[in-house]
Amino acid sequence: MASSGAGDRLFGFVQFDFAGTVGLPDGRYLAREPGGPPAPRQGETEDGEQSVLVVSTEGAPAPGRRRRRRPRQSKPEAEPDSLPLARVTAVRAFEPFAGGEEAARWLDAATEAEDTIDVLVDEGAALLNRALHAIAAASGDPYMHSRSPESAVAVRIGYGSGQQVADGEWTDARLVDVRGGTRRRRSDDLRPLERVAAVLGGRERIDTSETLILRARTDLDAGRIREAALQLRVGLEALLIELSGALNDPGHDEDMAVLQERRGEAGELANLALRGELEAEAERRTRELIELAERVLRRRRVLRG
């Protein structure tokens, strides 16, 4: 976005404000779709980049010391320390606007319906989580976690010039609510807080298949199809054992029979994943099996109450 004329062009963006830090150093990160040509190195031309991730943190804590400070007395009446605010802007640099009128029409259309908002917000979150996954792998930190849009204190969709969006600013933007609507209704149907209490109270346990299928979904949504196929293989094996006869429900029995029948298919997909990237058809089958496994798990949660 430092290329000639980029400061005059207008770009759409999705922006997240998070309390605290996100784990990425402040700066601009150029990104292309996996499998495409690499993004330019520092100092090279930036023409034609697919996306830009901009991270800036207000009130960031001072860098850690080599030696820890000695423990200090903490007074109960003391005011809590203020948290830094991390602003993450996912810039849609692959689709610049011809002018202000086009950008304004795009913003109106983008924020008119819930499903359109969700698509753009998920797109921005996927770019952030792709960067977080990369830094976790590069640093060997297994506790670097993904960020969901719902965990942001504010989410915006808007547009601005190249210089504006590079600074986390905009020409026009709308605050969007990502905690309500269909996202909230899906969560309410499952009553997750009741289950949290049951798990922490020792009255219920989390099945291995739940953890593995969740990981498969995380990888799938992040575009890590090979990893998703490998997680699916072991997750499906665990699910077929753990949920066999778990419900007296015709739908459950039917779905379990389909999964049992396609068990070998999951193994084939995992073997393909070990050899390289999966083709579109293999990706479709992986997605289909993960969605079916999720449906089985979801039905069990709903019917058990």
Task: Show which residues each predicted segment covers.
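Charged, non-catalytic interaction/linker regions at domain boundaries
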Residues: 2-207
